[in-house]
Amino acid sequence: MQLERAAFSDPFSFLGPQYQSQTTALRVWLPGATSVKVRLSGHVEYQLLSDPRHSGIFVLNESIDMTEVHYELIIDWSGTEQILDDPYQYHDISPTDAQVHTPKEMYNHLGAHLFNVVRDGKQIQGVRYLVFAPNASSASVIGDFNQWDGRRHIMQRIDNGLWALFIPEHAVGTKYKFELKGPNGESLPHKMDPYGAHNEQYPSFASVVYDQTSYQWNDAKWQQRPVTEKQKEALSFYELHAGSWKRNENGDFLTYRELAEQLIPYILDMGYTHIELMPVSEHPFYGSWGYQPIGLFSPTSRFGTPDDFKYFVDQCHQVGIGVVLDWVPAHFPSDSHGLANFDGTSLFNDPDPRRGWHNDWQSFIYNYDQPHVREFLVSNALYWFEHFHIDGLRVDAVASMLYLDYSRNDGEWIPNWEGGNHNHGAIALLKWMNEEVYSHYPNAMTIAEESTAFPGVSAPTFAGGLGFGFKWNMGWMHDSLNYIREDPIHRKYHHDTITFPLVYAFSENFILSLSHDEVVYGKGSILDKMPGDEWQKTANLRAYMGYMYGQPGKKLNFMGAEIAQSAEWDHDGQLQWFLTQFERHSGMQSLVRDLNKLYTTEPALYQKDCEPAGFEWRLQDEAEMSVLAHERLGDNGERILVVSNFTPAPREDFRLGMPVAGQYELILNSDAHFYGGSDYSVISEASTEKVESQGLAQSIVITLPPLSTVFYRLK
């Protein structure tokens, strides 16, 4: 029997009230029950008869009109009575087409949501379950409520490849999964809800019904702030892994609420404008750092509930800190409870491994050519802005999405219809996602981690671009780190390495990123990349940080760089906070704090981060002394001179030609004693002299401390 195998796609045609010409046949399926009664409209009871042919089926044949009548089942389980509301009396629960195909609506309907149905003039509360599994032959909702028995709550196949069931009395906290059978009736692993708002950890990986409307936000002032042009703002991001920034005294994770209590004051003190969280979407393997997500609609329950995460964002906003999330639409893991082989087919990925499998990451690649995949991912992007008030998404591994031959040899990939290597489906997805985000949330930002020279990543879609607000400048990161790791005596031979990023600095809206990618897999810490002894390492890092903050582009530091952490990042521990008791580490922390303050308060350092008009070389080709000098310009004539000396030799009486006459005052020196520097004597004010230098009619004379970056402001 199909019911016994939970292999039934149309349970409403057999179960619940079956209307005939003169009578109503009520049929229920309760395997294991001893007897069943039905109570109509709260008072009239009838005994159902057991079907002698099929154990577990109980039938009532009476000349009664059950149209719109609410009834309950009184079930005897071998001496234990249970009263249940029969889900098969509720037929009209289908969503509209727009609700399941409009990205901004989908997350409010697909999955498990609190739902009310009117029967007999009263509101019946429960949960409506909707799952997209077009190739499944049957689907059931399973959980503690039915002992995880897929025979008890078989779903109805409706339009659009959806399965639906309304279960009365289900509420927030109900644990559930979907039991699906493949196209040929084959059993599949139990599946987490792809739209689940809350999920349990190993071993159950169960989804949990959640009410996303219950949290009371207090960030109205932040949400209603005027829309601004982000390219003109000072943006300084602190990239963070929630599980390893800091642990409690027992070595356990901080909760989202504890993180709010401890992290937010730190961010305020350090002067960062935004927290960028590595992925918080639910992921089964902690060691993936979130980059192998399964529950895309659920903040990981390792650190608390969805409301706890909302509290974290809320608290950030109340003190003026923005929150950006890493988002992973490039691939998904092969864990059996996730999207892999979801309905017995490659529903979310291309079945051909040359397009659907990523060998490097041992994960599936989304099939962006499929409309339902694009809808799913765009809906997820909007969901985080709508329900969690986030301020931006940093999209991971964009290059792997754009190119069909990404990390593949000849013969390992399939060209597109033009014979080329561009993934047109992925390009369409990214454009659509960006258009939807900026349309609905004009104060938002989207950021691409894109490691190639794909054109127009941060250009608007109407101009042929992908539509991102910003792009990580990974070329700058690699080139500048390659330069700074050279021994100072050899840097003159690599001078072009440090100057080359300025050739393309304004081809995109760039963020200069010192990300987690540079402190993992044996790469050591940022400090460890610096040459020399302990003092020289720290001095090099101070000079490098100063150079970074003086360059055009927004700023991003991964946690730990600001205290000159000596060890490579360890996701199983916490940052080396004990190092801040030592002068060179506390000094570095003070320098980064002051650099953030300088960057966010001096318009010349941020207003034209993305415009060529905001940058002028003063000294580009001084390779022999490894000195670089440039000016940053603001909208109203503000000028700041930034000079870096990347050798341990001080440069006294150093003359620089200046285009504007006047007095230049020292506003930051990375070699100052309170940063742990040598405190080499410097000139605090330099006035231009009518002495030609570097082709300019006037010049100033300054002193450059060893391994330093200095900032001078035109008064």
UniProtKB/Swiss-Prot annotation:
Source organism, top-level taxon: Bacteria
SUPFAM superfamilies with a match to the protein in the record: (Trans)glycosidases, E set domains, Glycosyl hydrolase domain
Any one annotated GO CC term: cytosol
MF term (GO), any: cation binding
InterPro entries given in the database record: A-amylase/branching_C (IPR006048), Branching_enzy (IPR037439), GlgB (IPR006407), GlgB_N (IPR054169), GlgB_N_E_set_prok (IPR044143), Glyco_hydro_13_cat_dom (IPR006047), Glyco_hydro_13_N (IPR004193), Glyco_hydro_b (IPR013780)
Keyword field: Carbohydrate metabolism, Glycogen biosynthesis, Glycogen metabolism, Glycosyltransferase, Transferase
One Pfam family matching this protein: GlgB_N
Pathway where this protein functions: Glycan biosynthesis; glycogen biosynthesis
Enzymatic reactions: Transfers a segment of a (1->4)-alpha-D-glucan chain to a primary hydroxy group in a similar glucan chain
Active site feature: D396 (nucleophile), E449 (proton donor)
BP term (GO), one: glycogen biosynthetic process
Keyword Transferase: yes
The keyword Nuclease is annotated on this UniProt entry: no
Listed EC numbers: 2.4.1.18
Family affiliation: Belongs to the glycosyl hydrolase 13 family. GlgB subfamily.
Entry function: Catalyzes the formation of the alpha-1,6-glucosidic linkages in glycogen by scission of a 1,4-alpha-linked oligosaccharide from growing alpha-1,4-glucan chains and the subsequent attachment of the oligosaccharide to the alpha-1,6 position.
Record text on subunit structure and interactions: Monomer.
PANTHER family: 1,4-ALPHA-GLUCAN-BRANCHING ENZYME
Protein name: 1,4-alpha-glucan branching enzyme GlgB
Organism of origin: Aliivibrio fischeri (strain ATCC 700601 / ES114) (Vibrio fischeri)
Taxonomic placement: Bacteria, Pseudomonadati, Pseudomonadota, Gammaproteobacteria, Vibrionales
Primary gene name: glgB
